[in-house]
């Protein structure tokens, strides 16, 4: 009774405490950092962005001094600022003339090599290169910074930066740029040096030099290199260990665009998709697109659940993660001679010595000392020799001690062996790299569609290697998640859509070296329409276009796509009209006069994929898609259409006209795709592929229809 009363008292106190904390957190008089987005920079010659931002703050706060209020002013590539505001002040700013949106600055998360060989970009003379243009290509990475001393970013053999470069090297104390790493900016007050390893990893994946004999303690030995090793890189550090704030991210876009980068790579994202006017990555990417800069963005790591993709704007290229043909496996050898195969990146070698196996989830340290602990939960034991556990992940993680992660069936087999054997023994071997013939397969963690903001725009767009990627790393960051890990490495293995994103960034840069004048939409179209068609290796929604988009990126095919689907800023503004943005708001965003007339259907945006969300009540349906293609292949070519239904699809698809005769380069022709059917499964999309072929080029677009059942 006494114990129960004490528990009740403690519970009540906790509830009161949490209530008071909650009240403090949601006090409307508390000042929070808000982003104030004001669209494009006004063209008036006497307009000074920062002065205008200060005037707004003075007016809304009633204070002549706004010291400590203005956090950042966005004034180089677009207009806006971030500031400390109360809720009532936020409301006041939102009602002011010239303001598009005001939203709280949230934190994004980081979305955490043989892969280039796997995609067909072999090292050396086997891959066609245009080194002169590649050396003039600049990629900006908005991430956790960079390790400038890494061999992956050595400037040996590089000339001075391209003349178009307008950036700076402000990396902080003891940070030096060079002719490879030509720019660095910090928005965190930590300096641009990478303390987490993530930014170093992504940058080297896309554009790192070829560095021979790299490995993780002998695992995955080979040459680490990026897709465009001759290109230049610039690091924009927006992330700390606590996250990547909206106001930092928007500042990085503001600078990167004005600095003169050719591409922007963003391997971070939120927990859920946001409306475009409140999504700093979508905002920054829009203004980048308007300046001819493609933004490549990771899809997110919240899969395999549907509607989890966070990168949903059509003006940026959204990347899902897949496996490659190399997997890391860690074998467990039992005392009875049986071998079980698990996953991990285990650099420790027990040299085949067998130790007693102890099974249990919550064991006293004295019971596991000098033994291999077998548990359903990864233990923090410091006295066990090794660990064997189980989970349903389809990728390997680095361990700080000998570890193998078994499938549930193999784990059950191991437990059965322990329970039926008087003195069970075993050993965990060092990880080995094996050939994976089932690749590529979409990783379970990769976020899935459908798109919840623009429901008729298919996302993700493309998939690329993002599982067990070996690339450069920061020696200041732990290789594992165990804080007791004392090892430090220059190259490490990571998995995530963060790792997939820079692969596509590298491909986009590779395309740009052959076609410097291609617009962001043309590069995006080339990547999507030449992708490998993915084969569903599983069942259910996680094995559909909502998982992989148009397919798996094919770098070599993408430099010669034949036909492309072009889009420009005006097309995207019309699309936003159809999303119910007002003419007044869109004039602020675009900087141009805008009149939204009529209803523009999302699905008629000239996008390389076609998607339509149907009403749940639709037992039978007919939808149309209008598209225009531009000939970038050869003159006097004839393209014939072909429809290929995917497994289980009963769609009826017609293309009109079914033949396109292109007399000249850059000629445009339009067509309509009509899709009809009935009784669509509410849990699965129904899909097909439209292929335009002239005998040399095969220009493929996925067609997806789905019920509002997600």
Swiss-Prot record:
Propeptide residues according to the Swiss-Prot or TrEMBL record: 24-111
Post-translational modification remark: The C-terminal propeptide is autocleaved.
A biological process from GO: proteolysis
Disulfide bridge partners, by residue number: none
Active site: 143 (charge relay system), 198 (charge relay system), 498 (charge relay system)
GO molecular function: serine-type endopeptidase activity
CDD domains recorded: PA_subtilisin_like, Peptidases_S8_3
Pfam families: fn3_6, Inhibitor_I9, Peptidase_S8
Domain PA: 354-414
Enzyme superclass (EC): hydrolase
Residues carrying covalently attached carbohydrate according to the record: 174, 221, 364, 419, 535, 568, 580, 618, 636
Cleaved signal peptide residues: 1-23
Major localisation: secreted
One annotated Gene Ontology cellular component of this protein: extracellular region
Residue ranges of domain Peptidase S8 in the record: 115-559
Keywords: Autocatalytic cleavage, Glycoprotein, Hydrolase, Protease, Secreted, Serine protease, Signal, Zymogen
Domain Inhibitor I9 residues, every copy: 33-110
Protein name stated in the entry: Subtilisin-like protease SBT4.8
Organism for this UniProt entry: Arabidopsis thaliana
